[in-house]
């Protein structure tokens, strides 16, 4: 059973933070050492789709949405290393899927997109 959090307050800034985080992630995808331009473009598209989906998450789930954005950032940052650490990639990928799972009830597409991001990063880094 998933944890439930009751949150109140002004979450308008959270959407901006999510968009900013994922815009930075999109811009850094070019730094992943890979010759697979198709996978690189696919990852950029998936991050864009994730950003759009997370901006539609209800206010009471913004904390979970922010966790998804931050975990996607960690995954891409890990993949950018000259020799990406396969264990860290696996942990970051699982973390992204788990963070997305927390939103599956309100935004199921986030879980699908997160899984596709993990697979695409694995293709780019040769860890598949």
Task: Give residue ranges: language-model regions.
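Short amphipathic alpha-helical segments that predominantly mediate membrane engagement
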Residues: 1-9, 19-103, 119-128
């Amino acid at each position: 059973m998933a944890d439930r959090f009751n949150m109140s307050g002004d979450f308008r800034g959270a959407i901006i933070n999510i968009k900013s985080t994922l815009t930075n992630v999109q811009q850094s995808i070019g730094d992943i050492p890979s010759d697979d331009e198709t996978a690189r473009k696919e990852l950029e598209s998936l991050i864009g789709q994730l950003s759009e989906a997370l901006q539609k998450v209800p206010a009471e789930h913004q904390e979970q949405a922010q966790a998804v954005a931050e975990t996607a950032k960690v995954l891409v940052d890990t993949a950018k290393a000259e020799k990406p650490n396969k264990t860290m990639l696996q942990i970051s990928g699982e973390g992204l899927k788990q963070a997305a799972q927390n939103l599956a009830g309100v935004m199921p597409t986030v879980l699908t997109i997160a899984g596709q991001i993990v697979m695409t990063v694995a293709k780019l880094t040769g860890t598949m």
